[in-house]
């Protein structure tokens, strides 16, 4: 038979062990790294890629057969696409309001209304991709942290991005996925689907990283999945398993960054 004193001693010891274990769990929980919010992740990614410099700078680069210039200053922006480096022969200009104008030898020319939006979208798209993830804090952007996932042994935050109809442009229905490295906040992979021209899905792998005046530029390998609209979250596994078809490389040539210093 167990005595009353022995029983009390047992339960006292048992309670003490339970309390110590509970305190230990609390300490471990408090020491565990906290997952940052999606806004904190995107802010860090933009800062890491040179966002504060991009805010007020002129950026020049060549893409395929055209020359591009982006000027951002005090919240305003002008995107240009030119046929020659000096921007004399033909210059397309897209301003902050979304107005598109084409100049030929410095004189504005008429562009059919049916083509204006197509040209504007083309100019905007090249400039948008050239400085990603800059732009992910635009008012029309909705961001969601899906999870933390490994790709080729590297840990990434997987961020889903969608757009509101108001301010999201003609392609507001497109969906994006960004893979942002958990250690240094670089964007190493991007996937998106689109609805125009019968629609489709693409997966892009960043390579050839360069830092120019504090701004990160990368080129991309552009892949296509076997099916038209697979879940974007499936594409990293398909990439690792060599199930994607390489369509092209997207190369930003000779990028220049000229900071604008306000008076």
Feature map (PLM): residue ranges:
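Bacterial N-terminal signal peptides
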Residues: 17-27
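Flexible, processing/modification-adjacent segments and terminal tails
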Residues: 34-40, 101-172, 194-197, 256, ...
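Solvent-exposed N-terminal domain segments of exported/luminal and surface proteins
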Residues: 53-95
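N-terminal leader/targeting segments and the immediate start of mature chains
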Residues: 30-67
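Extended lipid/amphipathic-ligand handling interfaces
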Residues: 45, 70-72, 207-209
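Gly/Pro-enriched, hydrophobic low-complexity segments
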Residues: 156-257
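N-terminal secretory signal peptides that target proteins for export/translocation
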Residues: 1-13
